[in-house]
Amino acid sequence: MESSKLLSLLRECTNSTKSLRRIKLVHQRILTLGLRRDVVLCKSLINVYFTCKDHCSARHVFENFDIRSDVYIWNSLMSGYSKNSMFHDTLEVFKRLLNCSICVPDSFTFPNVIKAYGALGREFLGRMIHTLVVKSGYVCDVVVASSLVGMYAKFNLFENSLQVFDEMPERDVASWNTVISCFYQSGEAEKALELFGRMESSGFEPNSVSLTVAISACSRLLWLERGKEIHRKCVKKGFELDEYVNSALVDMYGKCDCLEVAREVFQKMPRKSLVAWNSMIKGYVAKGDSKSCVEILNRMIIEGTRPSQTTLTSILMACSRSRNLLHGKFIHGYVIRSVVNADIYVNCSLIDLYFKCGEANLAETVFSKTQKDVAESWNVMISSYISVGNWFKAVEVYDQMVSVGVKPDVVTFTSVLPACSQLAALEKGKQIHLSISESRLETDELLLSALLDMYSKCGNEKEAFRIFNSIPKKDVVSWTVMISAYGSHGQPREALYQFDEMQKFGLKPDGVTLLAVLSACGHAGLIDEGLKFFSQMRSKYGIEPIIEHYSCMIDILGRAGRLLEAYEIIQQTPETSDNAELLSTLFSACCLHLEHSLGDRIARLLVENYPDDASTYMVLFNLYASGESWDAARRVRLKMKEMGLRKKPGCSWIEMSDKVCHFFAEDRSHLRAENVYECLALLSGHMESGQ
């Protein structure tokens, strides 16, 4: 009678500090009454200790109660460890069980052990346990066999997984769910749907789990029609109010760009889980609709659901995509007001948002308060500086990251190498290459492409070619980099040869490849070849030229003095006829060839279309200056002064002692600026006097 009361008390306990105190009292009472041999009480005590996360006390019960001859207790301990992802402990207990002379594993033992081997990736030992299961005669047990299916899926041994499943003499809905879920979780969404179809055709009725996984597979594959078909089955079989099924439907319709249907399903949900709210928000994130995301967040808070870090990160992503600073600041304010302990991903999302909205100072403030012992926070700063063209700061942040002892990863290296490419900072690039080698990442294809780009743009063609040859599977990007490298360093014929070789390997060039080819023609003055490739873009390669391609052609023709041909190309489309970049390129060619008539016409077009652009007035000034029309040139300068327009100062840089030092024209921010300018004046004097 006392035993039943104690068991009833243990079953009432939940995961709380108060419950833990009660459990300890019951535990003490069990010992006082001498009930150490009561198997049911012992099992219940182990289970409630695991529920309260008191693993040590659970182990203490196992070690000190006199009932280890019963496999029931061994299974309870292993199950507790397995449910809490303490897989090493699970296997340690199993090893002791195998060495126990008075107890042997049963069908309830193996699922926990199999799960542990799968989670730890112990393929060899997993196969051994499979053999032991067969020898023990439990391979026909539905739960044990389902566990083996899951284990092989974790090892990515899908054929073995299916073989075990197909050999099962008896299956139930749970075993079908196991195999379907395993394939879905391992990235095999198509196979998961195929198995779902087999399950139905075998006469098994899908339950909530089956339908949720099948809908999630449709979501991953963006297979809207199949998703709608499963939705109809959900309604027909009475699952239209199921929380998990509806959350999956909201996610599927959102990803398939059917937001109205997603919203309709969402509105009908009697109880909206956090997963459902997040799924609805993610649908609007994909469209960059930050306004709708913020509206859903407000409604979510009103209805009593606390946003998670995933919720906030998703909304910030929408704000970044739409460049909506106001909504982004609202989310940032919510994080501060709610005393939300923002994780690394929320802060990284804020940094990305502020950079995209042109608020670098705010991004730097967030970074200063962000966790800095992981690579993610540094990576977002480096990539953000790259995105706004501040190569110097990107390299500077990388140096800071290394100096504080944070180990760069693949993302770090692929982010910082383009900065070295743009700055032609070869020595810095070599230093980073050495770090990549030390990190044993030199075989990573993304890094090989980034290194190839860096060496080619820094003029080290020999090393670029070595890396190019080391890439096992050359894609369009790697070929394009080599074409660009040869073209920009005085070897246009080699560039065109590489272009032909690329096509022989069956690779179709893209717009960037053709841009590299046109650039190579431009550097070498290969006018006719350039015109041929430009005309073939649509007809042969099916590529629509963009502004950069037009700019290349204008430059090629402009250098050759074929200015009217260049002007005719600009006039071909409305998009190109008034484009500032194209007109400026042609205008520079007019200045070079002293073609004042066409140059004056283009300059007036630029001033008319871009009246607030200082560079427009500078090109006009240069035209008048080249023709010695000094009065007209002075009027342009006066106009610029009246409008408050200033030419952007020129920028130069130099590598010194593994550092990239940069400086601007008329820059006086350096502490020793006066000494620098005195030295420059002295050098200029010597040069003018011929000394």
Swiss-Prot record:
The keyword Repeat applies. One of its GO terms (molecular function) is RNA binding. It comes from the Eukaryota. Residues 658-688 are annotated as: Type E(+) motif. InterPro entries: E_motif (IPR046848), Pentatricopeptide_rpt (IPR002885), PPR_At4g14850-like_plant (IPR046960), TPR-like_helical_dom_sf (IPR011990). PPR repeats lie at residues 38-68, 70-104, 106-140, 141-171, 172-206, 207-241, 242-272, 273-307, 308-342, 343-373, 374-408, 409-443, 444-474, 475-509, 510-540, 546-576. One of its GO terms (biological process) is RNA modification. The keyword Repeat applies. Disulfide bonds: none annotated. Keywords: Repeat. Residues 582-657 are annotated as: Type E motif. Signal peptide: none annotated. PANTHER family: PENTATRICOPEPTIDE REPEAT-CONTAINING PROTEIN. Belongs to the PPR family. PCMP-E subfamily. This is Pentatricopeptide repeat-containing protein At5g27110.
